[in-house]
């Protein structure tokens, strides 16, 4: 059974984020995530605090942070504090980094740093002593436990890393074919580490637009494949063409560039190169019946959580339709 989540772009008023979070929990969404890009948008952790005190059961986290944007001990302290505030409802979503670093002219971090950061955060949140930068430290007050860790990735190496260290993996598209391709590497990483792949949770994250008007629906979400293209550009510089599926890479050939000041923005010129075919594969567009059909395809591909990037407008209506018509049909 697929569980449902939402992700906010933190450019909304805090009061609106609280309102939508409460509505989402009421409508059956079990997770509330938020982007972490502190220059482009508001800082996520105060907003997660508001989300925590205004919900009862919803699990919460950043989707995603990275090892380079904050000292690892700060990330651990933030999560451990929020775990106490929320009653142990925090998760950690983490990747190598994109907009929060690139907007400052920095590059994504290494997988070695990602792995080390995850272990540091786990240990500190569990109250264990560690040696950090040659100094023994311990957060003795951290008593709410380790947050589950979701690792974001696209390429074989990052996906194997997710299988090695993650409680879950974050895949930013809703294409069952690409998800199956990704999961083979997650499985390899898990098996190489002696872990049970079947226990690793799988998130498909993408925007949706429920409408019979496909032209409007596609235009509302066209920004998303453009966002994904930033990661694809990085991939094609690291791998040989035959190592990557053309369904993931071919669409960027007409990409002219990307302006992070219009990151994840409806109607952005960043998305001018994105075709309808790519939109239809990467996102969920169309009437309720089509949404349900696509979600069942994702579940068959191995997805355990579908995470709606709730930032395309008419957010209340999307939550209402999903809560009343889509989620019940998928459970």
Please tell me what each predicted stretch does.
Residues 2-15, 65-73, 143-154, 208-211, ...:
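Active-site mouth loops of central-metabolism enzymes
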């Amino acid at each position: 059974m697929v569980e449902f989540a939402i992700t906010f772009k933190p450019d909304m008023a805090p009061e609106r984020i609280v309102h939508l979070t409460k509505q989402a929990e009421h409508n059956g969404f079990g997770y509330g995530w938020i982007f972490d890009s502190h220059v482009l948008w508001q800082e996520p952790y105060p907003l997660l605090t508001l989300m925590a005190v205004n919900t009862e059961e919803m699990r919460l986290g950043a989707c995603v942070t990275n090892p380079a944007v904050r000292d690892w001990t700060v990330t651990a302290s933030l999560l451990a504090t929020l775990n106490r505030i929320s009653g142990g409802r925090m998760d950690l979503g983490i990747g190598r980094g994109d907009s929060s670093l690139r907007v400052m002219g920095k590059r994504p971090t290494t997988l070695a740093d990602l792995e080390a950061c995850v272990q540091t955060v786990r240990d500190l949140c569990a109250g264990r002593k560690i040696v950090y930068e040659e100094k023994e430290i311990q957060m003795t007050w951290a008593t709410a436990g380790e947050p589950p860790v979701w690792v974001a990735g696209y390429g074989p190496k990052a996906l194997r890393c997710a299988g090695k260290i993650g409680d879950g993996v974050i895949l930013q598209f809703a294409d069952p074919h690409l998800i199956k391709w990704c999961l083979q590497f997650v499985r390899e990483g898990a098996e190489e580490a002696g872990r049970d792949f079947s226990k690793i949770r799988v998130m498909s994250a993408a925007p949706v637009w429920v409408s019979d008007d496909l032209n409007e629906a596609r235009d509302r979400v066209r920004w998303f494949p453009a966002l994904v293209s930033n990661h694809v550009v990085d991939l094609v510089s690291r791998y040989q063409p035959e190592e990557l599926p053309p369904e993931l890479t071919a669409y960027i050939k007409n990409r002219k560039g990307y302006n992070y000041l219009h990151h994840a923005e409806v109607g952005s010129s960043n998305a001018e190169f994105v075709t309808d075919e790519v939109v239809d594969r990467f996102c969920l567009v169309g009437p309720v019946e089509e949404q349900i059909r696509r979600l069942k395809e994702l579940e068959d591909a191995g997805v355990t959580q579908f995470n709606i990037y709730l930032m395309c407008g008419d957010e209340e209506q999307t939550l209402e339709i999903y809560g009343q018509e889509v989620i019940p049909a998928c459970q």
